[in-house]
Regions:
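Surface-exposed helix-capping loop/turn segments at secondary-structure junctions
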Residues: 15, 77, 86, 175-180, ...
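Dinucleotide-binding Rossmann-like beta1-alpha1 core, especially the glycine-rich loop
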Residues: 1-71
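Non-transmembrane alpha-helical segments in soluble domains
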Residues: 6-10, 81, 85, 170, ...
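Mid-domain catalytic core of redox enzymes
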Residues: 182-312, 317-326, 330, 334-344
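Short glycine-/acidic-enriched loop or helix-start segments at secondary-structure transitions
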Residues: 9, 52, 191, 227-229, ...
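A residue-level signal for conserved active-site and pocket-lining positions in enzyme catalytic cores
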Residues: 38, 84, 101, 169, ...
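Active-site/ligand-binding neighborhood in enzyme catalytic cores
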Residues: 50-51, 60-189, 197, 212, ...
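Flavin (FAD/FMN) cofactor-binding core of flavoprotein oxidoreductases
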Residues: 322, 333-371
Length: 371
């Protein structure tokens, strides 16, 4: 979406032949679908025959009348719930947005601000979906830079995943004489005369080290940055809001499997008839998994034995300290496997290997002191 960012990415990792160099970006097709009622739906929802068949006649009629009602009875956009209802109608909101949104944020959409919806789906609505369908049918669709985020069909991706981009940047910094310090927790940002003059970091041994600086760029969560500021009086209200900002934490389980039970039923040709999806949004209410990534489709170079195995990532949203966060690695992996077996995506005996990764403060939340 940003030409400046795209140019920077491709300056670091140009679009070269992946069979000749590792330092390259791949152009990938974005295929994201919704898994609901043990069936696949396009993401965003399309007006195809398969959608109506999978939805069923009664649900289809409810969705149609619900959308028409929402066109003439607009709700005040004081919440994410009203934001979605205004664009899709209540029945579609309840089918495809309500449960999943609560899964992601741990809060009902009626208690979330409309800001997140305006950023995530922006101008997306039933009308924009129909417009996109007609543009594709008549060959007048614009490039990805000028379409809604949820309608983008291609993206560029590092050969070995996003971590490779930052490993490459770190390598370039070192080659130019710079130093990249790992396992240093920033605990202080010292300011003099309205300028950051030094940063205090704590090492894994507990030692505190001071680094004088001319420039300071922060990617810290605001919740951690504001309390670390020294040398100026941060207004109490600002400090209080910053330290109480809510965040959503994240756990991902990686599974190496022989195969997936779900197969490709699209017109897209795939290896061994595997599903073409990069992301699958799991809308089923009887499991806690939120999204499923199929890494073979992000980059075939991510999977050592691409021909005979699939590498998938199960995404769970939680809060640090809750029962999911505190669950042992072994128990969590077993729960994740059981959930995919339950919804007929894999077989237990096909699991070859697994890993478990926790990520704190993965997403800032749009409620509480955010307002």
């Amino acid at each position: 979406k940003s030409e400046e960012v795209m140019n920077w990415w491709q300056n670091i990792m140009p679009m070269a032949d992946p069979d000749k160099t590792d330092r390259t970006m791949l152009t990938r097709n974005r295929v994201s679908r919704i898994f609901f009622l043990r069936k696949f739906f396009d993401y965003p929802i399309s007006m195809k025959k398969e959608t109506f068949v999978n939805m069923g006649f009664c649900n289809m009629m409810k969705a149609g009348f619900g959308y028409l009602w929402s066109c003439v009875h607009k709700l005040p956009e004081t919440s994410l719930e009203n934001f979605y209802i205004n664009r899709f109608g209540r029945p579609l909101y309840e089918m495809f947005f309500e449960g999943y949104t609560e899964k992601v944020w741990g809060v009902h959409p009626s208690k979330l601000g409309a800001d997140w919806g305006s950023q995530r789906v922006k101008g997306l609505s039933i009308l924009s979906v129909l417009k996109d369908m007609f543009q594709k049918a008549f060959g007048t669709k614009k490039d990805n830079q000028h379409v809604e985020t949820s309608l983008i069909e291609q993206f560029i991706y590092p050969k070995y995943g996003p971590g490779q981009l930052w490993e490459t940047v770190a390598s370039d910094v070192k080659q130019m004489g710079g130093e990249v310090l790992m396992q240093h927790e920033v605990i202080g940002v010292n300011i003099e005369d309205d300028k950051v003059v030094s940063v205090v970091a704590k090492t894994t041994t507990g030692e505190e080290v001071v680094f004088p600086c001319d420039y300071f760029f922060s990617t810290m969560p605001i919740k951690d940055l504001v309390p670390a500021i020294k040398g100026i009086d941060v207004p109490e209200q600002v400090r209080e809001i910053a330290t109480s900002l809510p965040y959503r934490d994240f756990i991902t389980v990686g599974l190496c499997v022989k195969e997936m039970q779900i197969k490709n039923q699209t017109a897209i040709q795939t290896y061994k008839n595997r599903v073409p999806d990069t992301w699958i949004y799991i809308q089923e209410r009887d499991v806690r998994i939120g999204r499923l990534q199929v890494f073979n489709n992000w980059s075939p170079y991510l999977v050592k034995d691409y021909e005979n195995t699939m590498w998938i990532g199960l995404e769970y949203f939680c809060t640090e300290g809750d029962k999911f966060w505190n669950m042992s690695k072994e128990d969590f992996i077993q729960m994740a496997i059981d959930e995919l077996v339950k919804i007929d995506i894999i077989r237990k005996e096909d699991v070859l290997d697994a890993c478990h990764v926790k990520i704190k403060k993965a997403y800032p939340s749009y409620y509480g002191s955010y307002y």
